[in-house]
Amino acid sequence: MASTGRIPLWLVATIGGIAVLTVLGLFFYGSYSGLGSSL
């Protein structure tokens, strides 16, 4: 953690949360539309 103090923890958590929600959203959208049914 060399960058501790340079990058706010809340900013990292916010970006990480948005990224996770985006990936999960795309996964469920693909499964719902039938594109991810083969995965």
UniProtKB/Swiss-Prot annotation:
Membrane-spanning ranges: 7-27
Disulfide bond as UniProt keyword: no
Compartment annotation: Plastid, Chloroplast thylakoid membrane
Domain of life: Eukaryota
One of the GO BP terms on file: photosynthesis
A GO CC term attached to the entry: photosystem II reaction center
Leader peptide range in chain numbering: none
Pfam families according to UniProt: PsbJ
Principal cellular location given in the protein's record: plastid
Keyword entries, A-Z: Chloroplast, Membrane, Photosynthesis, Photosystem II, Plastid, Reaction center, Thylakoid, Transmembrane, Transmembrane helix
Membrane topology: Single-pass membrane protein
The keyword Plastid belongs to this UniProt entry's keyword annotation: yes
Record-linked InterPro entries: PSII_PsbJ, PSII_PsbJ_sf
Function: One of the components of the core complex of photosystem II (PSII). PSII is a light-driven water:plastoquinone oxidoreductase that uses light energy to abstract electrons from H(2)O, generating O(2) and a proton gradient subsequently used for ATP formation. It consists of a core antenna complex that captures photons, and an electron transfer chain that converts photonic excitation into a charge separation.
Cross-referenced HAMAP family: PSII_PsbJ
UniProt family annotation: Belongs to the PsbJ family.
PANTHER family named among the record's database cross-references: PHOTOSYSTEM II REACTION CENTER PROTEIN J (PTHR34812:SF3)
Self-association state and partner proteins as the record states: PSII is composed of 1 copy each of membrane proteins PsbA, PsbB, PsbC, PsbD, PsbE, PsbF, PsbH, PsbI, PsbJ, PsbK, PsbL, PsbM, PsbT, PsbX, PsbY, PsbZ, Psb30/Ycf12, at least 3 peripheral proteins of the oxygen-evolving complex and a large number of cofactors. It forms dimeric complexes.
Protein's recorded name: Photosystem II reaction center protein J
Gene (UniProt): psbJ
